[in-house]
């Protein structure tokens, strides 16, 4: 068993960049039927952060999807020797194959890695502590603080 599995690496689709700016994005489709996604991912700071990443990716000629998987594989604290893994999913078989293949391109440029760091600094105040989502807000190990 893995020590850590990355689940939902595209942050409910927000990291694909397909939704555009927060002000213009529609909550129709996947977000309408997933109120948990609205609460977790539909935040202005997240959309702004994706724009930071998207601009750096455009300069490199890659997508935010490719950059996200490569960042996770080569620049995060994941460690395959500990059994860490990325749960890769897709709505189509071709997308799944692309998601797997994209990691083979290797590490990202410093400019894209820096964009991820800037994006994180921009939105980290809005990011939940996931362990508290499932054990009660403010809890550690299931017990109230």
Please tell me what each predicted stretch does.
Residues 1-56, 129-145:
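Glycine-rich, positively charged active-site loop/lid region within alpha/beta enzyme cores that binds
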Residues 93-96, 100-134:
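Extended hydrophobic/aromatic segments used for targeting, binding, or gating
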């Amino acid at each position: 068993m893995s020590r850590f599995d990355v689940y939902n690496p595209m942050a409910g689709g927000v990291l694909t960049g397909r939704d555009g700016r927060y002000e213009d994005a529609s909550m129709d489709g996947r977000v309408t039927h997933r109120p948990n996604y609205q609460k977790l991912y539909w935040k202005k700071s997240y959309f702004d952060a994706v724009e930071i990443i998207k601009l750096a990716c455009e300069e490199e000629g890659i997508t935010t999807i490719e950059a996200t998987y490569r960042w996770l594989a080569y620049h995060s604290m994941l460690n395959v020797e500990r059994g860490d893994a990325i749960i890769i999913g897709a709505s189509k078989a071709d997308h799944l194959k692309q998601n797997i293949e994209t990691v083979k391109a290797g590490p990202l440029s410093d400019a894209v890695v820096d964009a991820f760091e800037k994006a994180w600094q921009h939105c980290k105040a809005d990011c939940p502590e996931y362990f508290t989502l499932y054990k009660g807000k403010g809890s550690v190990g299931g017990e109230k603080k």
